[in-house]
């Protein structure tokens, strides 16, 4: 593989990762499809995916840095209150939402990694699509938590339980958490913001664990390729998050569900 070819692959996968990581469409499903299409499916490819996820995480940190630092008691000016109640999103909300998936993820880490096959991803895309539809059709007519600061500890924990579904490769972490949030009475916009903020510790923890287990596949010659993928994923994710938060006020998740079904069909035709 030539250096130019490697950098092109890194750029393409960085775009795919950045576009899909925080949308309810499954970044894993897209990475598997595009990775197979590019012929980039070895152990180095898995390590590469872990590293470019850090670029996507950094995009969330840049978007919500005041809120994130505020959660740990470091304040850079006043964070605007989002909601109709006197509540405030606290670190305890995030910790409660993390517990279910962290416990299951640690216990079944090796089992989960063994599920990274197109057939499993295809099923997850379909089931996750139906969950998005269920969230739109069954959500309360009037959300109890309109803004991010209205979310209760109980709602945060329930969102965390839904997040466990994302341990199934191809399900979509954002799809599971946003759908779960809507079903327990959180507005679509607030559930999306909470999902993005929750992604930082969840993805960071999973990424560090994966990186620890696969660091021996790294070499200095891979640095340019990984750097291109990281930077590309960061920039594209930043644009994707900003755009998503704008359009989600005006559209439902039905188009995303339909898109998931289409991607599942592509997986079936290509890999089955």
From Swiss-Prot:
Bilayer disposition of the protein: Multi-pass membrane protein
Catalytic activity: di-trans,octa-cis-undecaprenyl diphosphate + H2O = di-trans,octa-cis-undecaprenyl phosphate + phosphate + H(+)
Gene Ontology biological process terms in this record: cell wall organization; peptidoglycan biosynthetic process; regulation of cell shape; response to antibiotic
Keyword Signal in annotation: no
Swiss-Prot/TrEMBL keywords: Antibiotic resistance, Cell inner membrane, Cell membrane, Cell shape, Cell wall biogenesis/degradation, Hydrolase, Membrane, Peptidoglycan synthesis, Transmembrane, Transmembrane helix
Compartment(s): Cell inner membrane
Family as reported in the entry's similarity comment: Belongs to the UppP family.
Protein name according to UniProt: Undecaprenyl-diphosphatase
The organism of origin for this protein: Pectobacterium carotovorum subsp. carotovorum (strain PC1)
């Amino acid at each position: 593989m030539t250096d130019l070819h490697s950098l092109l692959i890194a750029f393409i996968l960085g775009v795919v990762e950045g576009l899909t990581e925080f949308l309810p469409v499954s970044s894993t499903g897209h990475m598997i499809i595009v990775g197979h299409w590019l012929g980039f499916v070895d152990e180095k490819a898995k390590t590469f995916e872990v590293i470019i996820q850090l670029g996507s995480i950094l995009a969330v940190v840049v978007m919500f840095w005041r809120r994130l630092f505020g959660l740990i008691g470091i304040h850079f000016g006043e964070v605007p209150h989002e909601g109709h109640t006197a509540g405030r999103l606290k670190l305890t909300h995030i910790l409660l939402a993390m517990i279910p998936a962290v416990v299951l993820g640690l216990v079944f880490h090796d089992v989960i990694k063994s599920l990274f096959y197109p057939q499993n991803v295809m099923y997850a895309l379909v089931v996750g699509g139906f969950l998005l539809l269920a969230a739109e059709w069954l959500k309360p007519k009037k959300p109890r938590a309109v803004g991010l600061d209205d979310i209760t500890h109980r709602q945060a924990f329930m969102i965390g339980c839904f997040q466990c579904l994302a341990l199934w490769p191809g399900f979509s972490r954002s799809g599971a958490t946003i759908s779960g949030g809507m079903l327990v009475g959180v507005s679509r916009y607030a559930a999306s913001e909470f999902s993005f903020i929750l992604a930082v510790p969840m993805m960071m923890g999973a990424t560090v664990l994966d990186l620890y287990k696969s660091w021996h596949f790294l070499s200095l010659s891979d640095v340019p390729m990984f750097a291109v993928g990281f930077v590309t994923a960061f920039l594209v994710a930043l644009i994707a998050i900003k755009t998503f938060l704008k359009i989600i006020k005006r559209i439902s998740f039905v188009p995303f569900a339909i898109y998931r079904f289409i991607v599942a069909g592509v997986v079936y035709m290509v890999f089955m």
